[in-house]
Amino acid sequence: MAELPLAPIERIIRRSGGEIRVSEDATIALRDILEEKAVEIAERAAKLARHAGRKTIKASDIKLAK
């Protein structure tokens, strides 16, 4: 997988923890979890769109799928 860039994820971790260092392993672990969760949500959203007779996933599908 590994499609999300690490830098923004590291910034998110640092912002959440204050003045703390973040290991590359921690950043990679969070990236992997976020990508996995994103795929799960996207798959559920696609099912919702198909069920509604649409070929386009809308923001409302994503919100319902989360």
Spans of features found by a protein language model:
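Histone-fold and other basic nucleic-acid-binding segments
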Residues: 1-66
